[in-house]
Every structure is written in C-alpha cells, then in structure tokens.
C-alpha cells in the first residue's frame, strides 16, 4: 500500500459528528454521529472501513451500514469501492461494537460496481492533504435490496480533521433527491480517531 492510500485511510478512520452544523441549521440538518471503522478485509491491497450512522437522539438505532474499500484504480489513482451487506440487520451497530465487526466476512458482502468513486488528492500544506471522492461521469449508483431498487448520489471530502459528505437518496424514476444532503454537504468533525485500528 502506498503512503497516500494509508494517509487516506487514517483521515477517514474515526467517529464523526456534525454538531456545529446541526446547531446552526437545525431545520435542515439532523445532529448525526458517523462511524468509519477499520475492518480486516481486502488487506492485500486495500483499506476496508465499515460505515454506519445514527441520530444523536437515537444512537441505539444506527442505519445505512455499508463498506468502503479504499484502494488503487487500474490507472494508479485512488478510488473508493462500495459494498452492500447482504443482511443489514446482522451488522447493525457494528460501528460501536467491535464484537460484531470481527464476525464480518467477505461472504457477507455484495460489490456495487456502479457505486465506485474516483479520488482526487490536493496538497494543502506539508503533510496535509484533502481527498475528494466523486462518482465517475454518467455513472448511476443503483442497487436492489429485498426486491426494492435504490439509487443514491455519493461523494465526500476529507482532511485530517473534517469530513463533508454529499450522499443523498434519489427517486429512481425521476432522479430527484428524497433524503440526505439535499441543501449541501453534511459537515462533520472527527471526535474519535480509529486509525490505530488500521492493519497497515
């Protein structure tokens, strides 16, 4: 793994909250906690992160579990591959429960080939970077779970201390946004650092 990929993983591995944003604009942004927890999968060439979030007032009801695989693209750049869990309920709560995390295996996952993000790297200062993950042009992230087809628009920006997420759900028929970052990104600050859990 390259130093660039490892830095990308270190920036993302953590527990994040958008407390300031939610206090400033409570009508538009729910106060969320987001977990990005390292997993010992794809270790030969990638960093795997379990992603999950919850409203602060319902931390015992996390939702949107998914797996991010940070790796290199065929062209040599960085990319983020998204995986869906075959049984969402079986992994619910893994963001704050390492016992559930440890039980996750490759057999629990389905790769979503239309949901891969290309990553651009900007140098901000000495040893300080910004990673911007965006979908490929004309790419539609669609998948089916329990007979229902979903479409989402994905994307994020991360630095050593902050994370902006652009994820939003779309109506597959009209393409209109129905949930998520409809008025701009969710703006998170890192509250806990999980980079020590990375196997690099």
UniProtKB/Swiss-Prot annotation:
**CDD domains per the record?**
CpcT
Drop me one GO molecular function for this one. Answer: lyase activity
So what EC number does this one have? 4.-.-.-
InterPro entries per the UniProt record, alphabetical: CpcT/CpeT, CpcT/CpeT_sf
Question: By its UniProt entry, which HAMAP family does this protein fall under?
Answer: Chrphore_lyase_CpxT
* Known role: Covalently attaches a chromophore to Cys residue(s) of phycobiliproteins.
* Family assignment from sequence similarity: Belongs to the CpcT/CpeT biliprotein lyase family.
State the name under which the record lists this protein.
Chromophore lyase CpcT/CpeT 2
Biological source species: Microcystis aeruginosa (strain NIES-843 / IAM M-2473)
* Source species taxonomy: Bacteria, Bacillati, Cyanobacteriota, Cyanophyceae, Oscillatoriophycideae
GN (gene name): cpcT2
